[in-house]
Amino acid sequence: MSKKGRSKGEKPEMETDAVQMANEELRAKLTSIQIEFQQEKSKVGKLRERLQEAKLEREQEQRRHTAYISELKAKLHEEKTKELQALREGLIRQHEQEAARTAKIKEGELQRLQATLNVLRDGAADKVKTALLTEAREEARRAFDGERLRLQQEILELKAARKQAEEALSNCMQADKTKAADLRAAYQAHQDEVHRIKRECERDIRRLMDEIKGKDRVILALEKELGVQAGQTQKLLLQKEALDEQLVQVKEAERHHSSPKRELPPGIGDMVELMGVQDQHMDERDVRRFQLKIAELNSVIRKLEDRNTLLADERNELLKRSRETEVQLKPLVEKNKRMNKKNEDLLQSIQRMEEKIKNLTRENVEMKEKLSAQASLKRHTSLNDLSLTRDEQEIEFLRLQVLEQQHVIDDLSLERERLLRSKRHRGKSLKPPKKHVVETFFGFDEESVDSETLSETSYNTDRTDRTPATPEEDLDDATAREEADLRFCQLTREYQALQRAYALLQEQVGGTLDAEREARTREQLQADLLRCQAKIEDLEKLLVEKGQDSKWVEEKQLLIRTNQDLLEKIYRLEMEENQLKNEMQDAKDQNELLEFRVLELEVRDSICCKLSNGADILFEPKLKFM
């Protein structure tokens, strides 16, 4: 009997050893998975540091390029100012020399005329008068010829100087174009490098996120196994209670049957004793087995309590991080409000532009009707020359007005199209996202929805299996879930606001208006240059046909002034171009910062959602035993 009892007592010990080994293996797997998760977190941190380093390098390169460009522009400005100063000094010297020459000529003429007057007063003869007249005519002709030759030489010199200035300007423009092309190529290469680094980082982040998702699935499977083991322990506890009740009933039966033992016959008493001994051995074995199972269940409960404390600490850390993110997102919310105000201002300006376009189209139609009426009157009526000239002048004036209004209408229509395009683009960017799909920087993430649905189903199944918990724990779970949902909704709303702000920045810093403005200024400068060339040709013709004119000095000064005005316009345009380039660069930098911020928010949001789902699932086995 003792050997049989030992063999039967060793079997539950072997079972307990197997269960302990399985629990130790599960614990080792969980620790290894936690270690790998920490390693992945460190890898993600290293990737962020690498992104920060790349960003710092890019900013340094941009600063270096801007410094180099500013130095080149300063050198060009100095060279241009030196050339303009030299031209100004040469023109001033020429003007002083011409003034001195004209003063000398006038003094000589005055002296000669004074001498002739003196001779006439003295009463000279007619021969003297004729001789003096011939001499005066010859001197005037010689002076006129010399002045004409001098003016022709000056015109040739001015033409040569103009050609040199045009060549220098063309050389400067070509140098600027080559430098701009080099800078564009360097900028494009830098942008390609940045995009390549971004793609590599995105690939690494996706790979890490996939690994984290796989590890989350493994953790979920292990937690399900723990839930199954907890259910088995509950069943064992129920079996233990049933066996305890059976033991109590057996003891009561033994007590009840012990009094009539003497009245039974001796054979029957021996049989009863044998049965009692066997029952005692069975009770002892059952008690030992139940004690071992109770010890195992107590150890499992301790492990689950430790796990619960760890998860509570992680939950507190996540709550702290969520509060920090809320504090960081406050300026973005304010920026969103400012962008909404700008949007309202743009809509009001669009309405004003539409009203202006309507008024201008009405005026244009009226002008066309007037022109058609005047043309019909001109066909059917014959007036004198004065009326014809007046009609032609009025027609020219009206035609110029119509052209100006047509230009204004074209500008307003272009601006209206641009604003409508921006409005459509903004409307497309403001479309609501679909349910169960999260729009991220990498695309549409549907696995997060699967993880959420899995967490909800596991939560519901565990709630059906477990015993009813206290109302305080239910309230805590409900509040935590509501907080997580609110955070997720807030993050998605802020992401959409950031997308809207980015679209507005792109529209505000677009290059169409700058290109149109440059084209207009270029056309205006070409028109001014053609006008100046026509003036120069007219002056040459006048000097050749009529001789010396009294207005050539004034026209020369006007040409010098127009040249200076053109140079000032070129300088202003260059300054505006530099300012626009700087604004474009600032807008691009701000855009990249917003993209990086959105990426960080998406990664943090996905990690918080997954950790919150995991925390809910991991809390459930603990709640089963409460």
UniProtKB/Swiss-Prot annotation:
Residues 1-365 are annotated as: Mediates association with microtubules. GO terms for molecular function: GABA receptor binding; kinase binding; microtubule binding; RNA binding. It is found in: Cytoplasm, Cytoskeleton; Membrane. Keywords: Coiled coil, Cytoplasm, Cytoskeleton, Membrane, Microtubule, Phosphoprotein, Protein transport, Transport. GO terms for biological process: cognition; protein transport. GO terms for cellular component: cytoplasm; membrane; microtubule; ribonucleoprotein complex. Residues 1-22, 452-477 are annotated as: Disordered. Disulfide bonds: none annotated. Its main location: cytoplasm. Associates with microtubules and may play a role in the microtubule-dependent transport of the GABA-B receptor. May play a role in JAK1 signaling and regulate microtubule cytoskeleton rearrangements. This is Janus kinase and microtubule-interacting protein 1. It comes from Homo sapiens (Human).
